Structure formats: structure tokens, C-alpha cells
């Protein structure tokens, strides 16, 4: 085991282990963050990270903020920046980018506070709006070079331990877990989940018509409408097993599993929200979707139709404009450019049109401001953004939770990477919930939009009983 000293930041080079093997060893831990590049190997699916035992855990729930379980009256933004200021070390090149720091999720509903969007009363749900840990120990994986590291940030235990074991003790314990022999576990999920559709087909049609009327009246050009499925979690189905059983069926580059004790998040997202690498900003919104076909000729036709679709291209252009405006507020003037427009990308069950916008930050301290400026993502709100969010707040039947918020990390080295948690299930109070939706524009066809929304989560919800009747609100899957 090789150790490299860099200020208080240490890098331990370990024998390579598959991230899933290590995840299975730590799966009973709470406050666990597993940022899982599960897609086909590539630049978007090169690095994975696993972190447990945060020095600090910040939770926002029912409009109250808790630090390590104690309610605090704080300015969240200032607190997060103060935590990042604990240690700002120079990035070590040639190793994965999350070199200790903050990691967790921000919900869509918390983002409404940023833009002062009124939250219309929804069904009672005290799902935590934010869960973020400050991690001084992070396992990192370079899947391309087959390397595993333990990143360690040695801090003054008397000042930062917050009643945890001393840093060195925790590091030794994590390394001992790493060395444990791996026992192969079955990831077969034999549970038959009964998914309940929260919004009936009739309600869905009514709300899409309402959105189109807003568009025709000039309120908006596009908005993202979503609906939810829920299922009771069987007693013998663990949260991590639910994640693993669908991970290989989705194979997305920005997958993640987070377990904060009272809530778990299983994200199978294909969409990058914000990446910061050496102060260079990248955002890659998705707009434009069609289901794949096992018939190669048919699949090629579907791809060609998607690429040539004026409707989908128009949706994509609108959202590119929203994201370009959002990052321009923080990036250096003149640095924001559209790098790619409506490129076709293929995932396990759908084809998408993906655009890429880039910019440059002045300093590391702009990262939080960048996130605040961009949250929630333009691809899951609409255009103009604020009015679209107001309409979403009016029409959504339930709070979105982590869906359409953000999951990722901010490294002490100044890098950051967040997904937009679409194709994401939340497990809370023994209930599994998953949302699906899409952008609605003036010429949207209601039946087509409904089917497209279901297609997006078809690898998670395998609906054997197609909903041929409006009142049939149950989909049975196995």
C-alpha cells in the first residue's frame, strides 16, 4: 500500500476491487454515498466513489436544519462554504476527482426556496429536502485503469470529530472492511411489486391540456410535467438489493445509491447536471426521447426520426437557452459556449438527444453560487424557468422529493459533479416511489407524451398489464 502526502490530504493506493464488491461490504452502513458509474466504460463512466462515516451530516426536513442530529438556526449556504473552507488542497492530477468533501442530495422541493416559488399544499410528506455529508474518507475507483484508492483527510480530531472515533481509527476500520474476503451474494429480486399510479390517465390528460392552454396564452413555451408511481416495500426487500437488482437493467453513467438511515435513494440517471473540472463548467441537458427497439431496422428508423424531429429539437433548444442563461450568471463573461447540440445518445431502453454547454469559473468559491444559480435544472422545469416552476407547483400532485433535484459531490480540490436524479426511486417510510415525465410544448400529443414518460422508467417498472382503462391504476411487475 503506497502513501502520498499532500498537506493533510493522503492518497492510499489499494489493490483494485470492483466497486460493487466494496459496496456489498459496506451496504449496512447508514450515511453511505455510492456514486456509481454503471454505464458502458467511457469518460462519463470512468470514476466511482463510495463514502461512509461523514464528519458532519446536514439534513433539512420540515423546514428545519439539523447538523449531526441537532437542530440549528443557520444560513445553509454559508455553512456549506465554511465546511468546504476546512481544507482547500490543490487537486492531485491522475487520480479520481472527488478528493474528500461534500456529497449527498438536494431535493427539487428545496430548490423552490431559492427562487421563492410558492409551494402549493401537496399530500402530507415529510421527506427530507436535503441530506449532505462532509466526508474525510472516500474510496475512489478508476474503472478505466483498474485502480482503487482510499482518500484520507487528516483533520484535528478534537475540533472536527463531533463524537466520532478518531480519524485514524476510522481509517483503519474502513481498510479492514476493504480487506475482508468478498462473499458472493445473490442480487435476485423475487418480490412482486404492485405499483400504484398516483395520477389517473384522465387527470394526466386534464393537466396536459391545462399546460397547453398556458402555452397558447403566452405564459410559457415549455414545462416539464411529471407523475408518480408508488409501491409498498416488502419486508424482505432491502434498499440496497432494490438498487442492485435494477442497476444492470439500466446501466446509466450517473447512477447512485444513498442511504441516510431514514431515507434511501436509488438513482439510475443518464443525465449530468453540473460538472466542474479545473474551473471548467459543463452541463448536459437531455430533451428528446424515444424507446429503443430490439429490431435493428426499426431501431434505426426510430433514431432517425428522433434526430429529425422538429418538436424534439425545439424542446432541446429551449432548454439549452435556459441552461446557458443560468451558468452565464456565474461564469466568466464570454466563456459560455454551446459545445454540442442535440446529439443522439443511446441507453439501455431509450435514445436521447443531449446537448452540452460549457463555461469557466473565476474561482473555486463560485461552485456553490453556480449550483444555486442553476438549481433546479432547466431540463426538468421549462422555459421561461420561473413561470414554468410556478405552473409545476400548481399542477404536480405530490412533492417531487429528490427527483429532479441533484445528487453529487463538491471536492475539497475544487472539482464537482452532479446528476439530475431522473429515473430515480426514493425509499421512505417503507414506500418506494418513482416519478416520470417529460417536456410539454404547444404541439404535444397527450397519448404520446404519456407513453414516453412510461418508457423512461420501463426498465424499473415492467408493466405486464398495460393500462387500457383509465380507472385501472395498478401495474403489476416482477
Question: Language-model segments: which ranges?
Answer:
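Extended alpha-helical targeting/anchoring segments
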Residues: 1-478
